[in-house]
Amino acid sequence: MRRLDGARKSGGAGLAGAGAAPHDVYTLPAGLPVPEDDGGADHLVGLELPSLVLESSLGDVNVRDFDVIYIYPQSGRPGVPLLPGWDETPGARGCTPQSCAFRDIHGELAALGVRVAGLSAQSLEDQLEFAERNAMPFPVVSDPERRLGEALRLPTFEIAGLTLYKRLTLVAEDARIVKVFYPVFPPDANAGDVLAWLRAR
């Protein structure tokens, strides 16, 4: 199994001076297992995004209204222990670095007319806290019943009694999926990869 060599760190609001603590949600530690393509997203290109209204950090949103939806397992909070086995689960770690990377290039995506949203199965309370702490300029969507996953048959995994989304990013054009990034690794590089793909079109 391939692993990430060398710790990677993404900036976060209010993180100035923080070190690579064991539960530093802004850091990707060295040695993370690299997820493999299990074919769980092979069917997605060509599908239409459903007309599905969900709660988000910026109010109710319809997933059809977005051009890029990055879907992630579960963001952490500083000082809160990770779920047992989180770092050993391929693709689990890195939700905050991924989100912060999308935040940091949001202006460039907006200049291309691209509307972005992040989405996980976490509660609205979790998404509101996360969005405020990290100054997210776009909606962070709450899908605790995994309704988008049911509509599109999105890949999931089980950990600590929870069913969570596997990390993937959907790019849509007129609400039809034209590109899927899956698996996504390292997570903090995904935003730049998406931007490069969009600019090359």
Q: What residues fall within each predicted segment?
A:
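Chalcogenol-based redox active-site neighborhoods
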Residues: 2-201
